Design a protein with these regions (language model features):
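Conserved structured catalytic cores and adjacent interaction surfaces
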Residues: 441, 449-464
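N-terminal targeting peptides and non-cytosolic leader segments immediately upstream
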Residues: 1-50, 55-59, 71-74, 343
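Short helix/loop segment immediately N-terminal to the Walker
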Residues: 325-334, 442-452
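Internal alpha-helical transmembrane segments of multi-pass membrane proteins
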Residues: 142, 146, 448-453
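A short secondary-structure junction motif
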Residues: 94, 435-443, 461
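Hydrophobic/aromatic interaction determinants used to assemble and anchor large protein complexes
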Residues: 53, 57-419, 423, 427-430
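Active/binding-pocket-proximal capping segment
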Residues: 393-398, 437-447
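Active-site proximal loops enriched in glycine and acidic residues that flank catalytic Cys/His/Asp
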Residues: 420, 424, 440, 458
Length: 464
């Protein structure tokens, strides 16, 4: 039984490693392009009236569920203006009454997400009622899946649009520069008008080709057009003179990401072009799986940027609190010294400087962001890239029991997973004092000497 299980695992690993690179369609030829008009004329799809009738029958069969979807969508739509007003009101007070609080920023992020929900809820409801009880290989199911995928693309786009709106979270709370906000807004609008239509058409046709094989070439051509459109959008978004890269160079010229933009910028732009080529060459399955990974990667970067913005906002709030506390301590020391006739300038030597706290915590935040990105990219891409799966077969060393049985194996993939852990440990040991001061010690009734001793002890704990 164990031998059979081992053989099954070997076959499963072989399939996972090589299935992605098996050609699933014939390459698109020039003759196929010339016959596209004839193919579309012969393609018999159900009329719109029949699809609408099927949708309505599913709605009337489940009236209470349909009413719940409708009420939720209408409620979110009616509250849209309320959400926007709350975001604007919080943003206007973020440097005033809320200057030393992080909670308003978290509230604004929640209101931003809520403001993006109404249209997505409507799309999801239509897709669910149309496809939930449809035949697996039917036009209704293909349209439902197309709407569902378009909704999945739309929701994060709409959240991003709400984040970068005037007086939004990105501007007022995160301090994103105009050099970043403007190209992001242009890219979101471009994808919203054109990209979502192409996403729906590509998904619908790629699914429909399993029913009508003759439209396979048309489906892959539409997919290739979508990928080239995304490549063009990324080209303009990451432009070195007017895009996000220009903003990155202006705000963080010494960061590792800014210094290496000549590597990652052309690589990111080339990925959709390669996917278009794969689809046209007949590797439609591989192109589809890699597109999902590309989609996840883009929103991993956006989510990481939002988390970094929240962390930077927390750091700013903490610095203000620490500055206020240190000012109060200095005033108290000065008053005590004046009352006793002692020198006040020697009584606060152990007080940690704000510049040191800021520098150490910034290093920790940036290192954490890079580690999250690296770990996320590894998790997203490892299932679809045989090169990464192949790392598990590179054995660096093994531990043997006295009878010669292998007890444990260390592969190259284990080392690559361990490296981020070692890096974060090094960063924690080096920057623990600033993090503790900003996160915990400012809230405790400790004097400067106790804070210094506690910082030292905890640094040793991380080291060992």
């Amino acid at each position: 039984l164990s031998q059979a299980s081992h053989i099954i695992d070997q076959y499963q690993n072989l399939i996972d490693t090589n299935l992605l690179w098996v050609r699933s369609d014939k390459p698109v030829r020039l003759s196929d392009i010339g016959r596209l008009y004839t193919i579309t004329k012969r393609f018999e799809s159900q009329p719109v009236g029949s699809i609408a009738k099927s949708f309505w029958s599913n709605v009337t069969a489940r009236p209470f569920l349909a009413l719940a979807f409708l009420l939720a969508t209408v409620a979110m739509a009616l509250c849209y203006r309320v959400f926007i007003r709350r975001i604007t009101a919080i943003s206007s007070s973020v440097n005033g009454s809320n200057a030393m609080r992080l909670w308003p920023t978290l509230q604004a992020v929640c209101f931003t997400v809520c403001a993006a929900l109404p249209v997505w809820l409507a799309l999801s409801a239509i897709a669910w009622f149309l496809g939930r009880y449809a035949e697996p290989e039917s036009t209704e199911a293909s349209i439902s899946n197309g709407l569902w995928v378009a909704g999945l693309v739309f929701l994060p786009l709409e959240i991003l649009r709400q984040l970068i709106r005037p007086h939004g979270v990105a501007t007022a709370h995160f301090g994103w520069p105009e050099l970043v906000i403007k190209p992001l807004g242009q890219a979101v609008r471009r994808i919203g008008w054109v990209g979502l239509t192409l996403v729906f058409l590509a998904t619908f046709l790629l699914l429909e080709r399993y029913i009508h094989r003759e439209i396979s070439a048309l489906a892959r051509i539409v997919f290739a057009i979508l990928m080239l459109f995304i490549a063009g959008t990324l080209w303009r978004l990451l432009d070195t003179k007017s895009g996000v890269v220009a903003g990155l160079r202006a705000t963080q010229p010494d960061s590792l990401i800014a210094k290496l933009e000549w590597i990652w910028r052309p690589f990111i732009i080339a990925i959709p072009v390669v996917l278009a080529g794969l689809s046209l060459s007949g590797y439609a399955y591989a192109a589809g799986q890699l597109t999902v990974s590309l989609y996840q990667t883009i929103w991993l970067v956006v989510a990481t940027a939002v988390l970094q913005g929240i962390a930077e906002r927390w750091l700013l709030v903490s610095k203000r609190r620490i500055a206020l506390r240190q000012l109060k301590e200095q005033v108290a020391i000065k008053e005590q010294a004046e009352a006793s006739g002692a020198a006040a300038d020697l009584l606060d030597v152990n007080q940690m400087k704000l510049s040191a706290i800021d520098e150490q915590t910034h290093r920790l935040i940036n290192a954490s962001v890079l580690i999250v990105l690296f770990s996320g990219l590894l998790w997203i891409w490892s299932p679809v890239l045989p090169a990464l799966s192949f790392l598990e077969s590179i054995v660096l060393w093994q531990e043997l029991t006295p009878d010669g049985t292998i007890s444990s194996t260390v592969s190259l993939s284990n080392v690559l997973v361990a490296l981020p852990t070692l890096l974060i440990t090094f960063v924690l040991v080096r920057n623990t004092p600033g993090l503790l001061e900003a996160l915990i010690l400012q809230r405790l009734p400790l004097d400067n000497a106790a804070r210094y001793a506690l910082n030292t002890l905890i640094s040793y704990v991380f080291a060992f």
